[in-house]
């Protein structure tokens, strides 16, 4: 238990414990429903978890402001002092959250010189690291817009841009602010700025730029997604190809999942060379060691194989069929379903004697028959059956098909 307390020697008053962490509260605060929580726990619940209900009462928290419960905090401190002989450590008095006016002054003063800008960013980094309440205060004071302006306009000073980019990511800004940044056309477009950093930036900045671009494009409306420039696709694919970090790779893949449902974007992604890069990734054990990466990769391949250019690029890669076939029944239901959809797309629209023979030799037909036999999603089975029936004349009586699979072949 917290503070080195021996629970067999001393009983902790239950109202000293945070309802979330069940540990002694170090900084008790009251939410709008009247329940007291430890600040760190409720901030994680509200901001990191993006929940807006009270964990105890389940009522909506209408006001995100947290009111310090000074009376309870002093009572806990007194209790800690009285029980020091039992090994109870006194909780320190927490520092008060930063105020909005102080932040606004900090931003105003930074405009006077480059040195003041550097000092401002250092102070902001310190404030961000203290608690989530400070992050919300910085957001209210316009810090995300201030940082985005540096990222967009201060290309001559790489270190300043890198620091602003780092801070902007760690602010964990709300969807509303992300939309404002995306819609702000007064300064340089934030998507364009992040794309440039992904192209020219240092290692860490490329990672943060990719993570930020993912967050921003998640709140984009369909028209904003459909009008993305080809350079965005080029740099996202380059991030995947460079494999600079697992975080960046997953973020880049997530971006493609979000923007490739739109027809125009599929063509841009194919032209950027994403299909061959994804197939190479699917052959990389470090990428396939976790389920989510291969799942997203299969989703993107499925989306891109819905256009003729995508199917052509897919079949241009010598390992494509084998790699996709291998993921069926090996990763997850989602991955299996998307893999079968990819094979159905190429089998329906690109069937040639050579392709059908290749699919037979690589075990695709046997794998599809297996899908029909095992516990698998109904839609996945339907698509597997559709592909098998489509080419039954070629596949069903082939000596390449194992005898035990011939019995499973749909009539």
Curated annotation (Swiss-Prot):
Pathway: Protein modification; protein ubiquitination
Subcellular location: Cytoplasm
Gene3D superfamilies: Leucine-rich Repeat Variant, Zinc/RING finger domain, C3HC4 (zinc finger)
Main location (coarse class): cytoplasm
Enzyme Commission code: 2.3.2.27
Any GO CC annotation of this UniProt entry: cytosol
Domain U-box: 11-86
A single MF term (Gene Ontology): ubiquitin protein ligase activity
Broadest EC class assigned to this enzyme: transferase
GO biological process, one term: response to water deprivation
The protein's assembly and partners: Interacts with RPN12A.
Protein name per Swiss-Prot or TrEMBL: E3 ubiquitin-protein ligase PUB23
The encoding gene: PUB23
